[in-house]
Amino acid sequence: MTISDVPTQTLPAEGEVRLVDIGSLRLESGAVIDNVCIALQRWGELSPTRDNVVMVLHALTGDSHVTGPAGPGHSTPGWWDGMVGPGAPIDTNRWCAVATNVLGGCRGSTGPSSLARDGKPWGSRFPLISVRDQVEADMAALAALGITQVAAVVGGSMGGARALEWIVGHPDRVRSALLLAVGARATADQIGTQTTQIAAIKADPNWRNGDYHETGCRPEAGLKVARRFAHLTYRGEIELDSRFANDGQGGEDPADGGRYAIQSYLEHQGDKLLARFDAGSYVILTEALSRHDVGRGRDGIHAALRGCPVPVVVGGITSDRLYPLRLQQELADLLPGCAGLEVVDSIRGHDGFLVESEAVGELIHKTLRLAEDRSSRPW
Protein backbone atom coordinates (compact mmCIF):
# COMPACT_ATOMS: atom_id res chain seq x y z
CA MET A 1 0.00 0.00 0.00
CA THR A 2 1.33 3.44 -0.91
CA ILE A 3 -0.12 6.85 -0.12
CA SER A 4 -1.14 8.79 -3.22
CA ASP A 5 -2.53 12.30 -3.52
CA VAL A 6 -4.76 11.26 -6.43
CA PRO A 7 -8.28 10.53 -5.18
CA THR A 8 -9.70 7.18 -6.23
CA GLN A 9 -12.98 7.53 -4.33
CA THR A 10 -15.26 10.40 -3.38
CA LEU A 11 -16.24 11.87 -0.03
CA PRO A 12 -19.65 10.76 1.23
CA ALA A 13 -22.55 13.15 1.55
CA GLU A 14 -22.66 14.90 4.91
CA GLY A 15 -23.39 12.40 7.69
CA GLU A 16 -23.57 9.45 5.29
CA VAL A 17 -21.42 6.38 5.94
CA ARG A 18 -19.03 5.49 3.12
CA LEU A 19 -17.01 2.27 3.06
CA VAL A 20 -13.63 3.29 1.67
CA ASP A 21 -11.69 0.47 0.02
CA ILE A 22 -7.99 0.72 0.87
CA GLY A 23 -6.91 -2.65 -0.57
CA SER A 24 -4.36 -4.75 1.29
CA LEU A 25 -2.82 -3.45 4.50
CA ARG A 26 0.52 -4.68 5.82
CA LEU A 27 0.52 -4.52 9.58
CA GLU A 28 3.30 -3.57 11.96
CA SER A 29 3.68 -7.30 12.69
CA GLY A 30 4.24 -8.10 9.01
CA ALA A 31 0.85 -9.79 8.59
CA VAL A 32 -1.36 -8.64 5.72
CA ILE A 33 -5.12 -8.07 5.74
CA ASP A 34 -6.64 -8.16 2.25
CA ASN A 35 -9.60 -6.18 0.98
CA VAL A 36 -9.70 -3.73 3.86
CA CYS A 37 -12.60 -1.28 4.08
CA ILE A 38 -12.77 1.66 6.45
CA ALA A 39 -16.15 3.17 7.33
CA LEU A 40 -16.01 6.97 7.14
CA GLN A 41 -18.31 9.94 7.68
CA ARG A 42 -17.84 13.66 7.23
CA TRP A 43 -19.51 16.92 8.20
CA GLY A 44 -18.74 20.24 6.53
CA GLU A 45 -17.31 20.96 3.10
CA LEU A 46 -13.80 20.10 2.00
CA SER A 47 -11.97 23.26 0.94
CA PRO A 48 -10.66 23.54 -2.65
CA THR A 49 -7.12 23.18 -1.28
CA ARG A 50 -8.14 20.19 0.89
CA ASP A 51 -6.49 21.76 3.93
CA ASN A 52 -9.38 22.05 6.40
CA VAL A 53 -9.87 18.44 7.51
CA VAL A 54 -10.19 17.74 11.24
CA MET A 55 -9.92 14.05 12.06
CA VAL A 56 -12.12 13.08 15.01
CA LEU A 57 -10.90 9.81 16.51
CA HIS A 58 -13.21 7.63 18.59
CA ALA A 59 -12.54 5.65 21.77
CA LEU A 60 -12.71 1.88 22.24
CA THR A 61 -16.38 1.20 21.50
CA GLY A 62 -17.11 4.31 19.44
CA ASP A 63 -17.53 4.57 15.70
CA SER A 64 -17.66 7.08 12.85
CA HIS A 65 -21.02 8.50 13.99
CA VAL A 66 -19.69 11.49 15.92
CA THR A 67 -22.82 13.59 15.68
CA GLY A 68 -26.43 13.24 14.60
CA PRO A 69 -29.49 11.24 15.63
CA ALA A 70 -29.88 7.49 15.75
CA GLY A 71 -31.22 6.04 12.54
CA PRO A 72 -30.54 3.47 9.81
CA GLY A 73 -27.03 2.15 10.41
CA HIS A 74 -26.76 4.10 13.69
CA SER A 75 -28.43 2.44 16.65
CA THR A 76 -27.32 5.28 18.93
CA PRO A 77 -26.98 9.06 18.54
CA GLY A 78 -23.61 10.63 17.89
CA TRP A 79 -21.11 9.98 20.66
CA TRP A 80 -19.85 13.61 20.68
CA ASP A 81 -23.00 15.54 19.79
CA GLY A 82 -22.45 19.25 20.17
CA MET A 83 -18.74 19.11 19.34
CA VAL A 84 -19.23 19.05 15.56
CA GLY A 85 -21.58 21.21 13.49
CA PRO A 86 -22.31 24.80 12.47
CA GLY A 87 -21.08 27.06 15.28
CA ALA A 88 -19.81 24.08 17.32
CA PRO A 89 -16.20 23.82 18.55
CA ILE A 90 -15.42 21.99 15.31
CA ASP A 91 -17.36 24.51 13.26
CA THR A 92 -18.45 22.94 10.00
CA ASN A 93 -18.82 26.40 8.46
CA ARG A 94 -15.00 26.44 8.53
CA TRP A 95 -13.80 22.87 8.98
CA CYS A 96 -14.50 19.52 7.35
CA ALA A 97 -14.79 17.02 10.19
CA VAL A 98 -13.98 13.44 9.22
CA ALA A 99 -14.34 10.34 11.38
CA THR A 100 -13.66 6.69 10.71
CA ASN A 101 -14.60 3.47 12.39
CA VAL A 102 -11.25 2.09 13.46
CA LEU A 103 -9.58 -0.91 11.83
CA GLY A 104 -10.68 -3.97 13.82
CA GLY A 105 -14.03 -2.40 14.68
CA CYS A 106 -17.52 -3.65 13.95
CA ARG A 107 -19.34 -0.57 12.67
CA GLY A 108 -18.48 -0.92 9.00
CA SER A 109 -14.70 -1.24 9.02
CA THR A 110 -12.89 -4.52 8.51
CA GLY A 111 -12.69 -6.52 11.74
CA PRO A 112 -13.17 -10.02 13.15
CA SER A 113 -16.85 -10.14 12.16
CA SER A 114 -16.08 -9.14 8.54
CA LEU A 115 -15.93 -11.72 5.79
CA ALA A 116 -12.48 -12.87 4.72
CA ARG A 117 -11.56 -13.82 1.16
CA ASP A 118 -13.11 -17.28 1.61
CA GLY A 119 -16.50 -15.76 2.42
CA LYS A 120 -16.36 -16.75 6.09
CA PRO A 121 -15.98 -14.37 9.05
CA TRP A 122 -12.40 -13.64 10.02
CA GLY A 123 -13.04 -14.68 13.61
CA SER A 124 -9.91 -16.08 15.25
CA ARG A 125 -7.95 -15.64 12.02
CA PHE A 126 -8.05 -11.86 12.30
CA PRO A 127 -4.47 -10.82 13.09
CA LEU A 128 -3.35 -8.81 16.07
CA ILE A 129 -3.27 -5.11 15.25
CA SER A 130 -1.66 -2.07 16.82
CA VAL A 131 -2.66 1.54 17.26
CA ARG A 132 -0.12 2.34 14.54
CA ASP A 133 -1.91 -0.04 12.18
CA GLN A 134 -5.15 1.81 12.90
CA VAL A 135 -3.51 5.12 11.99
CA GLU A 136 -2.08 3.68 8.77
CA ALA A 137 -5.55 2.46 7.81
CA ASP A 138 -7.07 5.87 8.51
CA MET A 139 -4.38 7.60 6.47
CA ALA A 140 -4.94 5.21 3.58
CA ALA A 141 -8.69 5.90 3.66
CA LEU A 142 -8.06 9.64 3.54
CA ALA A 143 -5.55 9.21 0.73
CA ALA A 144 -8.14 7.33 -1.31
CA LEU A 145 -10.26 10.48 -0.99
CA GLY A 146 -7.38 12.72 -2.07
CA ILE A 147 -6.52 13.94 1.44
CA THR A 148 -2.89 13.52 2.47
CA GLN A 149 -2.63 16.19 5.19
CA VAL A 150 -5.02 17.26 7.93
CA ALA A 151 -5.43 20.44 9.92
CA ALA A 152 -5.85 18.60 13.22
CA VAL A 153 -6.37 15.25 14.86
CA VAL A 154 -8.61 15.20 17.92
CA GLY A 155 -9.21 12.23 20.19
CA GLY A 156 -9.63 10.93 23.71
CA SER A 157 -8.72 7.58 25.28
CA MET A 158 -8.01 5.16 22.40
CA GLY A 159 -8.68 8.09 20.07
CA GLY A 160 -6.01 10.01 21.96
CA ALA A 161 -3.57 7.13 21.45
CA ARG A 162 -4.29 7.25 17.72
CA ALA A 163 -3.83 11.03 17.68
CA LEU A 164 -0.49 10.63 19.45
CA GLU A 165 0.67 8.09 16.87
CA TRP A 166 -0.41 10.47 14.10
CA ILE A 167 1.79 13.30 15.32
CA VAL A 168 4.80 11.19 16.29
CA GLY A 169 4.75 8.88 13.28
CA HIS A 170 3.60 11.37 10.64
CA PRO A 171 4.30 14.93 11.85
CA ASP A 172 4.42 16.20 8.27
CA ARG A 173 0.78 15.24 7.74
CA VAL A 174 -0.89 17.14 10.60
CA ARG A 175 -0.81 20.77 11.75
CA SER A 176 -2.08 20.38 15.33
CA ALA A 177 -3.49 17.83 17.74
CA LEU A 178 -5.65 17.44 20.83
CA LEU A 179 -4.67 14.55 23.10
CA LEU A 180 -7.32 13.86 25.73
CA ALA A 181 -7.26 11.41 28.64
CA VAL A 182 -4.42 9.28 27.30
CA GLY A 183 -0.80 8.40 28.03
CA ALA A 184 2.39 7.64 26.16
CA ARG A 185 2.04 3.90 26.81
CA ALA A 186 -0.28 1.43 28.48
CA THR A 187 0.31 1.16 32.22
CA ALA A 188 0.33 -2.02 34.29
CA ASP A 189 -3.02 -0.99 35.78
CA GLN A 190 -4.58 -0.52 32.34
CA ILE A 191 -3.16 -3.78 31.04
CA GLY A 192 -4.41 -5.57 34.14
CA THR A 193 -7.97 -4.30 33.81
CA GLN A 194 -8.00 -4.85 30.04
CA THR A 195 -6.67 -8.42 30.13
CA THR A 196 -9.22 -9.24 32.83
CA GLN A 197 -12.00 -8.00 30.57
CA ILE A 198 -10.68 -10.17 27.75
CA ALA A 199 -10.52 -13.15 30.11
CA ALA A 200 -14.21 -12.67 30.94
CA ILE A 201 -15.11 -12.83 27.25
CA LYS A 202 -12.92 -15.84 26.54
CA ALA A 203 -14.35 -17.70 29.56
CA ASP A 204 -17.80 -17.60 27.96
CA PRO A 205 -18.48 -21.03 26.37
CA ASN A 206 -19.96 -19.26 23.35
CA TRP A 207 -16.62 -17.58 22.59
CA ARG A 208 -15.44 -20.71 20.76
CA ASN A 209 -11.91 -19.36 20.36
CA GLY A 210 -13.36 -16.36 18.52
CA ASP A 211 -15.12 -18.43 15.85
CA TYR A 212 -18.72 -17.94 16.98
CA HIS A 213 -20.08 -15.67 14.25
CA GLU A 214 -21.76 -18.46 12.27
CA THR A 215 -23.00 -20.47 15.26
CA GLY A 216 -26.03 -18.33 16.07
CA CYS A 217 -24.69 -17.81 19.59
CA ARG A 218 -22.54 -14.93 20.82
CA PRO A 219 -20.47 -14.69 24.01
CA GLU A 220 -23.04 -12.31 25.45
CA ALA A 221 -22.45 -13.04 29.12
CA GLY A 222 -18.70 -12.55 28.78
CA LEU A 223 -19.02 -9.29 26.87
CA LYS A 224 -21.48 -7.89 29.40
CA VAL A 225 -19.17 -8.69 32.32
CA ALA A 226 -16.25 -7.10 30.45
CA ARG A 227 -18.25 -3.95 29.86
CA ARG A 228 -19.39 -3.76 33.48
CA PHE A 229 -15.80 -3.94 34.66
CA ALA A 230 -14.62 -1.44 32.06
CA HIS A 231 -17.37 1.02 32.89
CA LEU A 232 -16.22 1.18 36.49
CA THR A 233 -12.85 2.45 35.22
CA TYR A 234 -14.57 5.03 33.01
CA ARG A 235 -16.50 6.80 35.77
CA GLY A 236 -15.36 8.62 38.90
CA GLU A 237 -15.51 7.01 42.35
CA ILE A 238 -17.08 10.07 43.96
CA GLU A 239 -19.64 10.35 41.16
CA LEU A 240 -20.73 6.72 41.51
CA ASP A 241 -20.97 6.89 45.29
CA SER A 242 -22.96 10.11 45.19
CA ARG A 243 -25.38 8.59 42.67
CA PHE A 244 -25.78 5.09 44.07
CA ALA A 245 -24.11 4.78 47.51
CA ASN A 246 -25.04 1.34 48.89
CA ASP A 247 -28.70 1.66 47.92
CA GLY A 248 -30.81 -1.17 46.65
CA GLN A 249 -32.25 -1.04 43.15
CA GLY A 250 -35.81 0.24 43.26
CA GLY A 251 -37.79 -1.92 45.66
CA GLU A 252 -35.08 -4.61 45.84
CA ASP A 253 -33.31 -5.40 49.10
CA PRO A 254 -29.66 -6.57 48.76
CA ALA A 255 -29.93 -8.13 52.23
CA ASP A 256 -32.60 -10.43 50.81
CA GLY A 257 -30.89 -11.31 47.54
CA GLY A 258 -31.91 -8.16 45.68
CA ARG A 259 -29.61 -6.06 43.55
CA TYR A 260 -27.73 -2.93 44.47
CA ALA A 261 -28.46 0.20 42.45
CA ILE A 262 -24.88 0.28 41.15
CA GLN A 263 -25.22 -3.36 40.12
CA SER A 264 -28.34 -2.60 38.09
CA TYR A 265 -26.62 0.40 36.49
CA LEU A 266 -23.65 -1.69 35.37
CA GLU A 267 -25.92 -4.44 34.06
CA HIS A 268 -27.68 -1.80 31.97
CA GLN A 269 -24.34 -0.63 30.56
CA GLY A 270 -23.51 -4.20 29.57
CA ASP A 271 -26.88 -4.67 27.87
CA LYS A 272 -26.47 -1.43 25.92
CA LEU A 273 -23.08 -2.43 24.56
CA LEU A 274 -24.29 -5.90 23.65
CA ALA A 275 -26.90 -4.37 21.35
CA ARG A 276 -24.29 -2.62 19.22
CA PHE A 277 -20.88 -4.25 19.57
CA ASP A 278 -19.06 -7.44 18.63
CA ALA A 279 -17.06 -9.35 21.24
CA GLY A 280 -14.33 -10.18 18.73
CA SER A 281 -13.79 -6.50 18.01
CA TYR A 282 -13.78 -5.78 21.74
CA VAL A 283 -10.95 -8.27 22.23
CA ILE A 284 -8.91 -7.12 19.22
CA LEU A 285 -9.18 -3.41 20.06
CA THR A 286 -8.54 -3.93 23.77
CA GLU A 287 -5.43 -5.96 22.96
CA ALA A 288 -4.22 -3.12 20.73
CA LEU A 289 -4.69 -0.68 23.60
CA SER A 290 -2.67 -2.89 25.92
CA ARG A 291 0.22 -2.80 23.43
CA HIS A 292 0.09 0.98 23.02
CA ASP A 293 3.60 2.40 23.45
CA VAL A 294 4.60 5.46 21.45
CA GLY A 295 8.27 4.80 22.27
CA ARG A 296 8.38 1.29 20.79
CA GLY A 297 11.05 1.17 18.09
CA ARG A 298 11.77 4.89 18.55
CA ASP A 299 14.46 4.77 21.24
CA GLY A 300 11.91 5.09 24.01
CA ILE A 301 9.16 7.47 25.03
CA HIS A 302 11.42 10.42 25.83
CA ALA A 303 13.07 10.39 22.39
CA ALA A 304 9.78 9.79 20.55
CA LEU A 305 7.99 12.69 22.21
CA ARG A 306 10.92 15.11 22.23
CA GLY A 307 11.32 14.63 18.49
CA CYS A 308 7.70 15.56 17.67
CA PRO A 309 7.40 19.14 16.33
CA VAL A 310 3.59 19.33 16.05
CA PRO A 311 1.78 21.97 18.17
CA VAL A 312 -0.44 20.09 20.59
CA VAL A 313 -2.99 20.59 23.35
CA VAL A 314 -2.91 17.93 26.08
CA GLY A 315 -5.94 17.59 28.35
CA GLY A 316 -6.67 15.43 31.37
CA ILE A 317 -9.56 14.86 33.79
CA THR A 318 -9.05 15.37 37.54
CA SER A 319 -10.98 12.23 38.53
CA ASP A 320 -9.74 9.94 35.74
CA ARG A 321 -8.63 6.72 37.40
CA LEU A 322 -7.99 4.84 34.14
CA TYR A 323 -5.66 7.48 32.64
CA PRO A 324 -4.66 9.57 35.68
CA LEU A 325 -3.35 13.10 35.26
CA ARG A 326 0.27 12.07 35.73
CA LEU A 327 0.12 10.41 32.29
CA GLN A 328 -1.01 13.59 30.56
CA GLN A 329 1.54 15.58 32.55
CA GLU A 330 4.27 13.39 31.07
CA LEU A 331 3.01 14.12 27.56
CA ALA A 332 2.77 17.84 28.25
CA ASP A 333 6.29 17.92 29.72
CA LEU A 334 7.95 16.02 26.86
CA LEU A 335 6.13 17.27 23.75
CA PRO A 336 7.93 20.44 22.58
CA GLY A 337 4.76 21.76 20.95
CA CYS A 338 2.72 21.71 24.17
CA ALA A 339 2.41 24.90 26.23
CA GLY A 340 1.31 23.02 29.36
CA LEU A 341 -1.24 20.55 30.65
CA GLU A 342 -4.90 21.58 30.42
CA VAL A 343 -6.87 20.16 33.37
CA VAL A 344 -10.62 19.56 33.19
CA ASP A 345 -12.13 19.57 36.68
CA SER A 346 -14.79 16.87 36.77
CA ILE A 347 -16.11 14.15 39.08
CA ARG A 348 -17.14 12.04 36.07
CA GLY A 349 -13.88 10.19 35.65
CA HIS A 350 -12.37 9.11 32.36
CA ASP A 351 -15.67 9.73 30.56
CA GLY A 352 -15.27 13.41 31.39
CA PHE A 353 -13.72 13.91 27.96
CA LEU A 354 -17.06 12.87 26.46
CA VAL A 355 -19.45 14.70 28.77
CA GLU A 356 -17.72 17.90 29.95
CA SER A 357 -18.72 19.68 26.76
CA GLU A 358 -17.89 23.27 27.68
CA ALA A 359 -14.39 22.59 28.96
CA VAL A 360 -13.52 20.13 26.20
CA GLY A 361 -15.00 22.47 23.60
CA GLU A 362 -12.56 25.16 24.70
CA LEU A 363 -9.66 22.74 24.28
CA ILE A 364 -10.85 22.02 20.75
CA HIS A 365 -10.95 25.77 20.04
CA LYS A 366 -7.35 26.08 21.26
CA THR A 367 -6.28 23.18 19.07
CA LEU A 368 -7.86 24.63 15.95
CA ARG A 369 -6.31 28.02 16.64
CA LEU A 370 -2.95 26.26 16.52
CA ALA A 371 -3.93 24.79 13.15
CA GLU A 372 -4.92 28.25 11.91
CA ASP A 373 -1.60 29.68 13.08
CA ARG A 374 0.25 27.12 10.98
CA SER A 375 -2.03 27.31 7.95
CA SER A 376 -0.02 30.07 6.28
CA ARG A 377 3.31 28.33 6.83
CA PRO A 378 4.90 25.62 4.68
CA TRP A 379 4.36 22.13 6.03
UniProtKB/Swiss-Prot annotation:
For this UniProt entry, the molecular function terms from Gene Ontology, in alphabetical order, are:
homoserine O-acetyltransferase activity
Q: Where in the cell is it found?
A: Cytoplasm
InterPro entries to which the protein is assigned, alphabetical: AB_hydrolase_1, AB_hydrolase_fold, HAT_MetX-like
**Which superkingdom does the taxonomy of this entry point to?**
Bacteria
The UniProt record lists the EC number as 2.3.1.31
EC top class, in one word?
transferase
Q: Where is the AB hydrolase-1 domain?
A: 52-356
Extract one GO cellular component term from the record: cytoplasm
Show the PANTHER family listed in the entry: HOMOSERINE O-ACETYLTRANSFERASE
**What family, per the record?**
Belongs to the AB hydrolase superfamily. MetX family.
User: Its quaternary structure?
Assistant: Homodimer.
Q: What is this protein called?
A: Homoserine O-acetyltransferase
Q: Which gene encodes it?
A: metXA
